Amino acid sequence: MNRVILSLKNIDKTYGKEQVLHNASFDIEQGEICGLIGENGAGKTTLMRILLGLIQSDKGEIKSVSQHKIGSIIESPALYPNLTGRQHLQYYKTRFSLKTDIIKMLELVRLPQTSWDRKVKNYSLGMKQRLSIAIALLDNPELIILDEPVNGLDPQGISDLRKMILNLRDQLGVTFLISSHILSELEFITDKYIIMKKGKILNVMSSKELANDLSEKLFLKTSANQILKTFLKEEGIVHFEQDDYLVVPEKEKLMLLLEYSVASNLVIQDIYIKKERFEDYYLSNII
């Protein structure tokens, strides 16, 4: 097991009469890319603000690397529109007396060299995200916290961001905690999922555990679905309809359904097995 660099135990937070975090607990190990998953209003941003020391929890314990070893982008990137990308890094390097090579940072986040001396007001959102992450890297953090980083990005921007995060983890050993409600965009890079609902941590699971938890469903389309549907009901087999298909969550029922279809002279027009997507799992089990 890798070194635990962040540990939360029993974190509570209340605003007025509304409790927005309830007994939140989880650990993050060095080098992990962790997805903090939940609907808007689940408490993700509040939790991240507590981790960064921007607000205080009402109770609970946090053990982590020192604050200067945590970089972050919370909500939209805070940049100065009339400064260039290079000037941003030079400003923060001077302000905090850092010795980091700013050219190396710009190259690490793959910000195009032609944009280094261009004013940020002329940057795309994806370029602004890259620059913000370069700023977060200036103090050589062990952990970077990103709040909804894919918001507003086009598909190419999302793909580029994923590649950059993987590259930074692999090259520098940086650990990431990334919040999102766009689940499919984290599915390709996440090592661990922390699933939240209404301020509570519902589950903490590795990507391997989640993959094992995703079911494989049988999709079947015949010349007379209604007859087959009646048979499924009589046999007590769980099923539902999707478009023109009957969907059976138990793929093991395949032979039984084939035998019945042949015996009943039903023409099988299409049949396949499909693994449940994370998005579907989330919608059916969490929301």
Regions found by a protein language model. Name each.
Residues I37-E39:
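The feature captures the beta-strand-to-loop junction immediately N-terminal to the Walker
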Residues L52:
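Helix-to-loop junction immediately C-terminal to a conserved catalytic motif
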Residues I144-E148:
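Catalytic Walker B motif of ABC-type/P-loop ATPase nucleotide-binding domains
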Residues L166-L246:
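ABC transporter nucleotide-binding domain
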Residues E216-N285:
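Short, charged/small-residue-rich alpha-helical element at the C-terminal edge
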